[in-house]
């Protein structure tokens, strides 16, 4: 039996849901293929959305009318703004989510989307004619003819779970792996690699001694992810905090040989910034303890996720470890932690549209491209789904640049540098992070979404209202001006150069906010709190944007500079251990080569340029 679609999306995880929604919103008749409808939107690992760098991605997805922000707002049970004490450009909105509420909200969003069908079935193979994908073949003989396919396999591509010496072929616990598609990709000539991720044991919250633990509350004023969310209405909860002990560390060291990671059973590389507890003890064993956040998985679910003790140790060792951790001495383990290996495709096999170079019409998104994290997957899914719809319709595909979105930074990093370990988004990866803030994602991307036809009427009305208020506030701030003497009479001391400064320029000063300006011009008192905060943020950053452009231009000017082979990077202050190791091992020949290294950041590149200059000057002095 053959059914006809414009776009077929394979997989109902975070990448697949965004891809299917984006393709359908773009006008493509879309099929989302998954083994079971009730697994759509499942949070496979940690029950949280957002965080540093990741929260920016969620805001960008929302700005293009994607799903993740709205679903997270509906399911969030502990909202916190990370890096609150730092500048707005690096603050990270995050929420812990109720797993059930998140899954159900995502399923409802998929169910309500026009032009989108959910097809339950197992994908066995693709039909490819003259270098172009033409159909998806399902178990049972069903054929889905199509103009484009988005493949979002997550950890299912030849997935293999490890619990100590025990191995289970699975995509995640109790769900079958995808073996046929891995063979399909291999036959097509794709360069495949092996990666690994892990998850901690799940605990019964009723058996945890909460009274003995430190607690962490949600923010009193939760900040939603979505422009479409007026406020958070889901009840907010507290989390518990505990730490590993010296007894924990001794037990882990004594059993390292039984860990799948350290026994040689696992060939895949794990995420550097989400290490297993075994890795933490081996690499940072001199610490007194490692923090563990005890995160309830739902409002009516006693399951607790102990964030910080991901492991592939045997089940009996995991039980003994729990007994050494304060508050968990009598905890019941509902499911053991495990590591999972899976295949991924070298992302350099992709165009920046996320279409593969080998097969026209085939797009990849999510962990198959070597990333880690729900948010990274969702961002890729949105872009891949949009471009798949445009490919099927014969339209021009979209590339997001590094200057306009973190999604663009991520895709450029992946497709130009490749990966040797799972890729995670950080704000430090962006050259233009002062202008790529979480608070202005809508202004950067919603007009583009409207132009592409994927933003709803309701979204555009809400966006128009927000921008109307912001533009009015900007105009008012620029219309009011005062001299240094006038400012001094209001208690503000600035350079007495006789120059009149607008209210907008005055907002760049640390002691000036909209409330201060209201003392000078009462009209400012009518500006609402959200608009005021955004106006203050952009005004304060405006004075640094020219410097940001200059720094980026300087780095580009230095790209041709050669790096002497004798330069030692091991002791360079300010350079991360990751990059010290990579610079020492790979010895890039030039600044341009260093810039293309996986994990390189604009700030790190500036440090390397300065170090090479210093080294060359020192060598000349010696000569």
Curated annotation (Swiss-Prot):
One term under GO cellular component: cytosol
Gene3D superfamilies, per database record: FAD/NAD(P)-binding domain, GidA associated domain, C-terminal subdomain, tRNA uridine 5-carboxymethylaminomethyl modification enzyme MnmG/GidA
One GO BP: tRNA methylation
Binding positions (FAD): 11-16, 123, 178, 367
Cofactor or coenzyme needed: FAD
Compartments where found: Cytoplasm
Pfam family, one: SAM_GIDA_C
Predominant place of localization: cytoplasm
Domain of life: Bacteria
A GO molecular-function annotation: flavin adenine dinucleotide binding
Keywords recorded for this protein, A-Z: Cytoplasm, FAD, Flavoprotein, NAD, tRNA processing
Complexes and interactors: Homodimer. Heterotetramer of two MnmE and two MnmG subunits.
Function of the protein: NAD-binding protein involved in the addition of a carboxymethylaminomethyl (cmnm) group at the wobble position (U34) of certain tRNAs, forming tRNA-cmnm(5)s(2)U34.
Record-given protein name: tRNA uridine 5-carboxymethylaminomethyl modification enzyme MnmG
Source organism: Mesorhizobium japonicum (strain LMG 29417 / CECT 9101 / MAFF 303099) (Mesorhizobium loti (strain MAFF 303099))
């Amino acid at each position: 039996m053959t059914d006809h679609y414009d776009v077929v999306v394979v997989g109902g995880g975070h990448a697949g849901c965004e891809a299917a929604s984006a393709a359908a919103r773009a006008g493509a008749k879309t099929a989302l293929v998954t083994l079971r409808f009730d697994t759509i939107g499942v949070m496979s690992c940690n029950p949280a959305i957002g965080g540093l760098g990741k929260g920016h991605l969620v805001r960008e997805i929302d700005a293009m009318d994607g799903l993740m922000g709205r679903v997270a707002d509906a399911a969030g049970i502990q909202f916190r703004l990370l890096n609150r004490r730092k500048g707005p450009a690096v603050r990270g909105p995050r929420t812990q989510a109720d797993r059930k509420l998140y899954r159900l909200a995502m399923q409802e969003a998929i169910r309500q989307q026009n032009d989108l069908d959910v097809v339950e079935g197992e994908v066995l193979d693709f039909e490819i004619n003259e270098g172009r994908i033409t159909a998806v073949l399902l178990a049972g003989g069903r054929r889905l003819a199509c103009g484009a396919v988005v493949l979002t396999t997550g950890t299912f591509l030849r997935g293999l779970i490890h619990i100590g010496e025990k191995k289970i072929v699975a995509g995640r616990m109790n769900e079958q792996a995808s073996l046929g598609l891995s063979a399909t990709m291999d036959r097509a000539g794709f360069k495949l690699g092996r990666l690994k991720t892990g998850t901690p044991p799940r605990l019964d919250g009723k058996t945890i001694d909460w009274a003995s633990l430190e607690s962490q509350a949600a923010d009193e004023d939760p900040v939603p992810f979505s422009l479409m969310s007026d406020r958070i209405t889901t009840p907010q909860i507290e989390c518990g905090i505990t730490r590993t002990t010296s007894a924990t560390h001794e037990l882990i060291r004594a059993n390292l040989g039984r860990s799948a990671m350290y026994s040689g059973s696992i060939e895949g590389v794990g995420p550097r910034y989400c290490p297993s507890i075994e890795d933490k003890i081996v690499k940072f064993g001199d610490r007194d303890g490692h923090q563990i956040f005890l995160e309830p998985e739902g409002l009516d679910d006693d399951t607790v996720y102990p964030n910080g003790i991901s492991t592939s140790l045997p089940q009996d060792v995991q039980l003994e470890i729990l007994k050494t951790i304060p508050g968990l001495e009598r905890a019941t383990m509902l499911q053991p932690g495990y590591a999972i290996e899976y295949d991924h495709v070298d992302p350099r096999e992709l165009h920046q549209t996320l279409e593969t170079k080998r097969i026209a019409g085939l797009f990849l998104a999510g962990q198959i491209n070597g990333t880690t994290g729900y948010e990274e997957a969702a961002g890729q899914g949105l872009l891949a789904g949009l471009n798949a719809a445009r490919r099927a319709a014969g339209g021009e595909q979209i590339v997001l640049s590094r200057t306009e979105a973190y999604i663009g930074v991520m895709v450029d990093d992946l497709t130009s540098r490749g990966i040797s370990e799972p890729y995670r988004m950080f704000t430090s990866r962006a050259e233009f992070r002062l202008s790529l803030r979480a608070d202005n994602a809508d202004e950067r991307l919603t007009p583009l979404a409207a132009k592409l036809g994927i933003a709803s009427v309701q979204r555009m009305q809400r966006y128009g209202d927000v921008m109307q208020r912001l533009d009015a506030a900007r105009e008012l701030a620029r219309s009011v001006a005062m001299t240094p003497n006038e400012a001094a009479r209001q208690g503000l001391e600035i350079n007495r150069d006789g120059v009149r400064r607008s209210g907008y320029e005055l907002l760049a000063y640390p002691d000036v906010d909209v409330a201060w300006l209201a003392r000078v011009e009462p009209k400012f008192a009518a500006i609402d709190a959200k608009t005021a905060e955004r106006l203050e943020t952009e005004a304060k950053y405006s004075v640094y944007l020219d410097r940001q452009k200059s720094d980026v231009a300087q780095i580009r000017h230095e790209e041709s500079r050669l790096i002497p082979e004798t330069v030692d990077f091991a002791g360079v202050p300010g350079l991360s251990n990751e990059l010290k190791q990579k610079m020492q091992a790979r010895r890039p020949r030039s600044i341009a080569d260093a810039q293309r290294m996986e994990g390189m950041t604009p700030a790190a590149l500036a440090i390397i340029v300065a170090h090479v200059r210093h080294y060359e000057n020192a060598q000349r002095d010696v000569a």
